[in-house]
Each structure stands twice: as structure tokens, then as C-alpha cells.
Amino acid sequence: SEIMEYMVKYTPAEGGVMLQTEDEISACTMAIGAAYAGARAFTATAGPGLSLMAEAIGLAEMTETPLVVIDTQRGGPSTGLPTKHEQSDLMAAIYNTHGDTAKIVISPSSIEESFYDTFEAFNLAEEYQCPVIVLSDLQLSLGKQSVTSLDYGKLQVRRGKLVKDGLPEIKSPEYFKRYDLEAEGSISMRVLPGTPNGISLGTGLEHDEVGRPSENRAMRTAQSDKRLRKVRSVVDTFESPLYEDAPYPQSDLLIIGMAGTRAVISEVAEELREKGLRVNHVQIRLLSPFPVCALNHYLQEAKKIVVVEHNATAQLARLIKMNVPPCPELHSILKYNGDIFYKEELLAKCKEVL
């Protein structure tokens, strides 16, 4: 609601539009339609809304349409704890569509990162032509904090392979290869509706290179591989997949978190260092595709590893184990009663592991 209220206040003055739709399904599909027509569009929700948006997010994946979804996690399932803190949407954000997923999931861990990463989400969505989910939580999205400064000069709009009239790619009156299998980096040219000679189709069905529905087995395999392959390359281009407060080449304790746990983990890490322990702390900012190489170095050089998260099923720890084989032993510190972690509480839990 706070995002909506902010957009109502400021978007019209910048030439933008804010719509409050009848439900989350409409919100997501309208954002997809706006993006398909060339606008930068997003929708914001919480866990239940993300569940409703699942099929529409899959449509954006299949049509390779840019889409940004902001999910402020809360207690679930169902209505759950609508005004309390939790981090239980991680797996839902990555795998919430049926079929093989081809999306990007990022999770800022501070006010500054929220500002820069949300802007970057729009660049990623257009460059990789896929949905980008920004995963936040109540503590981070509703917390109030003063920051030193935000550098607007760092915000550079990148629209990716957006074809405009006059380029040689669209001089032919033939159907435009919107889903070109030989495109560099598996990212094909994107043409907006109404562009002369840029005729292509957009459908949720599997399709050939111009968008015509196709059940050809070889085409199905090739298009599926194309969608998955292009997203995997984000690992190599995302500027900082981890927040790293890690001064030690080898550590006695590595603490891993995501989203709003950064502040309390930082306090705990600092106190343990004052006691002579070598403590490294990282927050995972790029959750999908997973930054295996960036994280694995810290995992292999730590005597003990704890993963701090707000859910009952250790979703972040499970995600690490899924992507980093063989994975060292992980100790999960979990809290899922609707409240945040407090310093003394988390400090005591970390000492138990040590």
C-alpha cells in the first residue's frame, strides 16, 4: 500500500500512470501489456498476490516480455499474518510458475540497495526480456531510516535490444524473428507493436521464431533452452550479487542472510569480532540465478556457517544446498513468529553454533 500511495503522489507529475486494479491478476497482466507496448511497468504485492500472479508471470516468461514485480513478504500461507514479518516467499518467487522458470530474483538488504536495485530491476527486465522479482520484507520495506545520500548519477537507463524503425533488422516485409534462436547471448531483438515491418506474434503457447504456435519437438527444446540460457548469464553481469562484510580470508564463522536481516547480523558480527573471532557476513542479493562462484569461496573457507532467515523450512539454506554441491554443513537459525530478530537473541544463537 505504501508503494501505491507514493506512486499516486509522484507518478503523474513525471508523466506516469498509477492504476489500482480490481485484483492482483489484473495488475500483473496490465503491467505485462504496458511493457509489451513499450512502457516501463511494474506491480507491487505481498505473498498472496504473488500466488495469484503466478500464471501471468509465466506468460511474461514465455513471451519474453519485461516485467518487474515487487514482493514485500509477510506471514503465510493464505491470509496468514498480513502485518507481520516473515521471509517465506523465497521458493515461491523463484519457482512460482508451472513449467521451467526463466526469471530473475533479486533481494536488496538495505535502504540504499533497495533504491539502486529496484531501478536496476527495470534494466534487467528489458535487457534479458523476462520477469524480475524484487524480494523484500516488512522490516526493510516499512522501516524508516536516514541515509547519507543517493547518487542519481548512477542511474543509467538500459533498454536492451529494442529495435527501432530504420535498423536493417526490420527492413524486410517478412515476419520478424522475435524469438530468433541464433541471437547473440540468446537474447533476441524486441520490436514494439506498430513498428513498420516488425510483424511478430506474442502468445503463451510454445512458438517458433516469429511467435507462431508450434508443437515441433526440436523447436520446443530450442526455445526452452533459449529462455533458460539467457537468464543464467545474469550471474556474470550483475554488479554485486552479494553484500560482503568479510574481512577474513578464512573465518571461524560465516553468517549468511537475505533482505532485512542485514542490520542485526552486522551488529552481531561486530560484537563477535571484538571478542577475537574471525566472523564474515554476506547477504545474498541475487537469488536467481544463484551466484554459486561468488558464495562458494566463503563457504569453503569457513569453519562454521549459519544461515539466518525468517521462515520455518530454512528456504535460503535449502537454496544454497541445491546450488552448491558438495555444500559444507549449514546451521539454520530460524524465526517465524511474526517478529524480527533482536541482537542479543541472534548473538546467543550464534554462540551456540560456535
Where in the sequence are the language-model features?
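Residues at or immediately preceding the N-termini of alpha-helices
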Residues: 24, 111-114, 118
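Aromatic/hydrophobic pocket-lining residues that form the small-molecule binding cavity
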Residues: 53, 114, 265
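Active-site-adjacent "lid/gating" segments in soluble enzymes
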Residues: 105-107, 113, 126
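Thiamine diphosphate
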Residues: 1-95, 101-103, 107-108, 336, ...
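Active-site-proximal alpha-helical scaffold in enzymes
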Residues: 32-35, 39-42, 115-127
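A short small-residue
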Residues: 99-102, 206-208
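C-terminal structured domain segments across diverse proteins
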Residues: 80-83, 115, 146
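Flexible, low-complexity linker and terminal segments
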Residues: 117, 122-354
